Amino acid sequence: MAAGLAYNYAAKQVDETVLNALADLADEAQLIDKFQELYNGAVINTGEKRMVLHHLARTQLGDAVVVDGVDKREFYVAQQKKAADFANKVHTGEITNENGEKFTTVVQIGIGGSDLGPRALYIALENWAKANNTFKMEAKFISNVDPDDAAAVLASVDLAHSLFIVVSKSGTTLETLTNEAFVKNALVKAGLNPSKHMLAVTSETSPLAKSEDYLTAIFMDDYIGGRYSSVSGVGGAILSLAFGPEVFAQILDGAAAEDKLATNKNILENPDMLDALIGVYERNVQGYPATAVLPYSQALSRFPAHLQQCDMESNGKSVNRFGEPVDYVTGPVIFGEPGTNGQHSFYQLLHQGTDIVPLQFIGFKKSQLGVDVDIENSTSQQKLCANVAAQIVAFACGKKDENLNKNFKGGRPSSIITGEELTPASLGALLAHFENKIMFQGFVWNLNSFDQEGVQLGKVLAKRVLAHDTDGALKVYSDLLNI
């Protein structure tokens, strides 16, 4: 893998025969050819008739992609520069609040891919940035339409010294606009001018694009889906403000390097595709229903939640890319928590439950802050890493005991991604690895991994409830909740 990472699948239930079969499957399914079509600008999102260009936000793997006379690589780079220039002006004090004072906090208002990915990346690098003197501004996030979410965040910040990023591609997202109004109301009550505290990340055709209510607008387009948008202005604005544009650029560099590895037709030299194919084998041949993502790094505490959206929204489909029902299982359930916390939570089921759940561990040799203590001849970081090694062997080998309550059958497959330290570059490579894994699995299953119709029905019904246009079961549940 890129950026000093390594993918180890020694504890997976695959041998040379299986690997050869998976290599044949990769060729038969034309996985690399389909990836080439994607990054060269083919319409891969067949449902919405759109290209899929998140790779282009970090590097150009193939041909120039031009839409309506606009080179999309140049467009993405221009928006990254716009975000970088804005962040630098905030950091130097060229852009200030009404009293000429520097902003110290940035709050992102968004939901789904506008929250999960950027939040996960911010948390992942917060300690690294502090240790490396690149921490510029504290970042917070408002996502849920639950008013307690916004109220709690606003109560925790100094409004006069806070910037707010409103993220909505369409400019019409109900939850985001509701929370924006919540924030504006708080700013006005504090005697502040909202337009001096807010910027937008949106599309060029959105109502937010040219509004005077914002200090600036950073643009995205229809070709980068929300769950893949951390490398666009959706992640770029807040991460550049929090850590500096140079750190965000390092994330992109790590992702770009991993993307280049993903173009290799040899599955043993393409960790993203190999991981994907082993996952397909576990899902469709072995029949395993879920995958647990287990980072032994507190900095990656929200990374499983981001991958949960990225994977399940992409490949949680029961029809193929032509709209026809499939007669095989597709995407697994994804869940996870950081270790060692998870060991004292759901690992019991993973070790001794009736379902076998494949495991994806992530571990680093060094901590980010470098602050540690030696107790009983080992540091905390050594104890953390020892637990990873122990769990992999325990899951794979188990332990026989005549007392069945203490018997561990083993045979629980796992992989591990290891690195020296979690840095911006290795974080970018890690992000790209899982994005590419999901993409390759979607190709094998012949899915459109880049739409999310499953999100829409609930939105439509919720609007009916709020308009009091209900009957039947919808009315019963509306009345139950006193709407």
Short names for language-model regions:
Residues 12, 16, 73, 77-84, ...:
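Electropositive phosphate-/nucleotide-binding environments in soluble metabolic enzymes
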Residues 7-14, 23, 329, 335-421:
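Helicase-primase coupling helices
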Residues 121-126, 155-159, 181-183, 215, ...:
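Short, solvent-exposed amphipathic alpha-helical segments in soluble enzyme
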Residues 104-112, 164-170, 290-297, 334, ...:
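Short glycine-rich or small-residue beta-strand-to-loop segments that form or flank ligand, phosphate
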